[in-house]
Regions:
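Cys-dependent protein tyrosine phosphatase-like superfamily
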Residues: 1-133, 145-168
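Conserved SAM/SAH-binding loop-helix junction
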Residues: 142
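Conserved G/P- and acidic residue-centered "switch" motifs that form tight phosphate/ATP-binding loops
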Residues: 139
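Short cysteine clusters
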Residues: 136
Length: 168
């Protein structure tokens, strides 16, 4: 044996397998339902478990409706958008998620005033019991900057805040 497994993952799409691989066993329906219902959108990660998260823009990795349903399953009540193109407020309202927009140009940093304003808003929303997800396009650059800013706002030193946000 060469250390490779010749059996594909259950539920693997046939078009993703090479010609020599056997067909994948279908994932049982209960397992499919559980897998879909037990996680947030792809790339969704908690900074503060159950309170504050980062995520890619809903609809950028998967179907918009699926991503919004996944955010709702995770308990998200407010989506903070950092993209210049606004989210569809009607789609968010349809699943009961509020929306805050604070556009930051892609590959740019927020101004100090904008970062501080967002931190104040996040603190207020958390104090009111909101569960927040912050997003930009990929959920990395602008999202990570705001999440690190929030940690600094809480009193963490900058290096620790950056390292923590990078893990998200």
């Amino acid at each position: 044996l060469n250390g490779n497994c010749t059996v594909p993952t259950p539920g693997a799409e046939p078009e993703t397998l090479d010609d020599e691989s056997p067909a994948s066993a279908p994932l049982p329906e209960p397992a499919r339902r559980y897998a879909k219902q037990s996680s947030g959108p792809r790339g969704f990660l908690w900074l503060r478990n159950g309170v504050l998260a980062g995520t890619p823009r809903p609809g950028i990795v998967a179907d918009l409706d699926d991503d919004l349903e996944a955010l709702k399953r995770m308990g998200v009540t407010t989506l903070v958008s950092l993209t210049q193109t606004p989210m569809d407020s009607a789609a968010l309202a349809a699943v009961g998620i509020g929306h805050v927009s604070s556009p930051i140009p892609d590959m740019a940093a927020p101004t100090i005033e904008q970062a501080a304003g967002l931190c104040r808003q996040i603190v207020t929303m958390i104090g009111a019991g909101e569960v927040i997800a912050v997003h930009c396009r990929a959920g990395l650059g602008r999202t990570g900057t705001i999440l690190a800013s929030y940690l600094i706002w809480e009193g963490r030193d900058a290096l620790d805040a950056l390292e923590t946000a990078r893990r998200v």
